[in-house]
Design a protein with these regions (language model features):
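Acidic/histidine-enriched segments that form metal/cofactor-coordinating
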Residues: 4, 93-202, 340, 355-374
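Histidine-acidic residue clusters that define the catalytic metal-binding segment
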Residues: 26-33, 173-212, 244-246, 366, ...
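An aromatic/glycine/proline-enriched structural segment found at the starts
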Residues: 27, 176, 181-184, 209-276, ...
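M16/MPP (pitrilysin/insulinase) zinc-metallopeptidase core fold and M16-derived inactive scaffolds
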Residues: 28, 54-117, 183, 291-306
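C-terminal regions of mature proteins
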Residues: 35, 213-216, 325, 356-455
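M16/insulysin-pitrilysin zinc metalloprotease superfamily fold
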Residues: 81-87, 117-148, 314-369, 442-455
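Short acidic/His-enriched helical or mixed secondary-structure segments at domain edges of catalytic enzymes
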Residues: 152-168, 252-265, 302-303, 348-398
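A structural supersecondary motif
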Residues: 267-271, 289-327
Length: 455
């Protein structure tokens, strides 16, 4: 298989960048972890003047019932928007602005986090504010009403966005009855019912040392960290032992669910099984998913003109899945093209050249994204929570070297067996049987709609 000119021109540059970034990583002090009051603290010396600290609360959508979806997102936002016992919202933000520091909160399906970012010389000023935000948030009634209404307005706006709507339907259908069916930001119905008292009580119920993980990227002495983190954790109860649940998504048959919507085109999303984080198949499947993205894009858009932005992606969370997404006016032709492509890929496999090139592209992109302290902290945190191995963020280069072409082809065949499809648009244009039947055996792709004549 001959490589496109893009690859022949850029692969040497990518390899050079990867080598430079790897060399830079090796010059920094070695990362380490320690346990303080039962909480793991991961420390990556940064070699620069920026300090990034991320405190994670594990559990995500496992922490609340479906009728309370959105409560954790609202609570985390309140930590940075509703003041503390010592400062009003304005006073709190003014103190951060004076030293150009930032505090930010996030709530996801697997964990939530509160992050601080500042320069090393301001650490002693910002750290007490960070501790107050975690341990004594005010949950001021007036400020809470503001962020509560903001959350509702965002959900209303998202409901009218087809890409958001189809993804929400896909999760609710594929993971029905499971935690991953819940959306971290909730729904308009669930969030509207939430009030300041129950949101505050909920936050304090999940703020336990048994759920925490702390990640530090910066140049801070170990003794100073031990003292400051120890004081922080002394104000937080131990809580009951907590173990993250890992639920495998593995549909046993193809399914198709349609919802009529008045849209300019039709939106389709399918979910298949995928390896869970921390398993032997994960890295190989990550490569397979990325290569298939390129093949899918080429076949669906370039060769058949069926969609402007076809996509596939590997969601490697605690309930992992492989996602296929497209918007098209010809859903029946699309599924025929997709099935033929999947079958051809299963029969003929990915090539050694494709796997080699994707390793380089994947690693280079990963290292570039980890140039900032924030990106490094996020990578360390995700790998610890999902893979139970924070060092994977550092060893990925060596880990991928061990993945063979045979591994990549094996996992693609293993996991892409059955698809849970959802559809929004005109149901009359989609034949459900085409989506639910077993994959065809034909290797020949439907002919391209695009002309191959050169200008």
């Amino acid at each position: 298989m001959q490589l496109p000119s893009f690859y022949t021109k850029t692969l040497p540059l990518l390899a050079s960048a990867l080598l430079s970034l790897s060399t830079f990583a090796q010059t920094k002090k070695a990362p380490y972890d320690m346990t303080i009051d039962g909480v793991k603290v991961i420390v990556q010396p940064s070699g620069n003047e920026i300090v990034e600290i991320k405190t994670l609360i594990k559990g995500g959508v496992q922490n609340y019932p479906a009728d309370k979806a959105g409560i954790e997102s609202l609570a985390m936002n309140a930590l940075v928007e509703c003041g503390t016992s010592k400062d009003s919202k304005n006073s709190f933000k003014d103190k951060l602005d004076k030293v150009s520091a930032q505090l930010s909160a996030d709530a996801g399906r697997d964990y939530s986090s509160l992050t601080m970012n500042c320069i090393r010389s301001d650490f002693s000023t910002v750290w007490p504010l960070y501790v107050d935000a975690i341990t004594t948030p005010l949950f001021d009634e007036k400020e809470f009403q503001r962020i509560h209404q903001d959350a509702i307005n965002i959900l209303k706006a998202q409901a009218s966005q087809p890409d958001y709507s189809i993804d929400k339907m896909a999760h609710e259908t594929a993971f029905a009855g499971r935690d991953y069916a819940k959306s971290p930001e909730g729904t308009e119905a669930t969030v509207t019912k939430l009030n300041v008292a129950e949101t505050k009580a909920y936050y304090h119920s999940i703020l336990t040392r048994s759920r925490l993980l702390i990640v530090v990227v910066g140049e801070i002495d170990r003794s100073e960290l031990e003292q400051k983190v120890g004081a922080l954790l002394a104000a937080i109860p131990a809580g009951a032992p907590f173990t993250l649940k890992r639920e495998r998504f593995d549909p046993t048959h193809n399914s198709f669910k349609a919802e009529k919507k008045d849209l300019a085109t039709n939106y389709i999303q399918g979910l298949t099984a995928a390896p869970q984080p921390g398993t032997a198949d994960f890295n190989a499947f990550s490569l397979a998913a990325r290569i298939f993205y390129d093949r899918h894009f080429l076949e669906v858009r370039t060769n058949n003109g069926l969609s402007y932005a076809p996509a596939t992606w590997f969601d490697g969370g605690l309930s992992s899945s492989f996602n296929i997404s497209v918007s098209t006016t010809d859903p029946n032709k699309y599924v025929a093209v997709l099935k033929a492509l999947m079958e051809k890929t299963k029969k003929q496999g990915f090539t050694a050249e494709e796997v080699k090139n994707m390793k380089t592209t994947y690693l280079t992109g990963t290292y570039y994204r980890q140039e900032t302290n924030g990106a490094q902290a996020s990578a360390l945190a995700a790998n610890e929570v999902l893979h139970n191995n924070w060092r994977r963020a550092i060893t990925l280069n060596e880990d991928l070297k061990k993945v063979s072409v045979e591994d990549v082809n094996r996992v693609f065949n293993k996991y892409l067996a059955h698809v849970t499809w959802v559809y929004q648009g005109d149901p009359a244009k989609a034949t459900a049987d085409l989506y639910t039947q077993v994959l065809p055996t034909a290797e020949k792709l439907p002919p391209s709609k695009l002309s191959t004549q050169k200008n």
